[in-house]
């Protein structure tokens, strides 16, 4: 399990990384920005990370993106990294800075800059004092639920279990403990025998909805796997 300090530091870096990735597009926070303005902002983000003492903790992949100058043509590979925004809530929930994890039915769009006090008055020590870690049991439960969502997407897309009985498949693959997790979980319908999003079972979702759910569940599971293991950020291996 990662320490409170490690989790908070990683969340801060991820938010700065998300800001950098967003600069690949001309529209930033609803305002059209010139190439020079976006490059200036990229440098400002890097300087802020260095000044606050976070730059030494960024991963190799992140460093390559932070140090890549903004070009006229958007880098699609960098834009894909914006999916990491789904990693924020798992970390902030574990730190006690956000009350609960959002449902899996839509992307998280909340602005976490105020939560992490981004800006000139930012203080890691002050933020750390505000953090109150939830229990290991709660974290493990969140992780296992995210894993089941991730598995359900894989099953839906690839028919891994070749079964229409989702609970039976979960029992056969993961065991009784994972069935018990679903008993009081609001996004699992025992009658429909499936996870529910926006009133539809996963089986009823169209391709775009399944793809969105895949991104949400995969990124959240990635965050929880990092939280609960000794793996470095770029080296987390997802196994279902």
Language model features: what each stretch is:
Residues 1-240:
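Extended, charge-rich alpha-helical interface modules
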């Amino acid at each position: 399990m990662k320490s409170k300090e490690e989790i908070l530091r990683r969340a801060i870096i991820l938010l700065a990384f998300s800001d950098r990735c967003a600069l690949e597009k001309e529209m930033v926070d609803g305002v059209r920005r010139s190439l020079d303005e976006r490059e200036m902002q990229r440098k400002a983000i890097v300087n802020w990370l260095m000044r606050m003492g976070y730059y030494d903790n960024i991963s190799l992949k992140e460093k390559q993106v932070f140090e890549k100058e903004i070009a006229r043509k958007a880098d699609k590979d960098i834009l894909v990294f914006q999916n990491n925004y789904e990693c924020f809530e798992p970390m902030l929930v574990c730190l006690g800075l956000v009350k609960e994890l959002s449902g899996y039915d839509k992307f998280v769009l909340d602005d976490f800059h105020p939560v992490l006090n981004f800006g000139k008055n930012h203080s890691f020590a002050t933020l750390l004092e505000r953090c109150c870690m939830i229990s290991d049991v709660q974290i493990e439960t969140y992780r296992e639920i995210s894993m089941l969502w991730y598995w359900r997407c894989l099953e839906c897309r690839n028919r891994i279990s070749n079964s229409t009985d989702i609970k039976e498949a979960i029992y056969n693959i993961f065991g009784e403990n994972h069935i018990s997790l679903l008993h009081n979980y609001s996004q699992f319908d025992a009658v429909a025998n499936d996870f529910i999003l926006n009133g539809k079972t996963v089986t009823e979702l169209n391709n775009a909805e399944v793809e969105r759910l895949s991104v949400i569940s995969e990124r959240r599971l990635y965050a929880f796997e990092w939280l609960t293991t000794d793996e470095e950020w770029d080296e987390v291996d997802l196994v279902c």
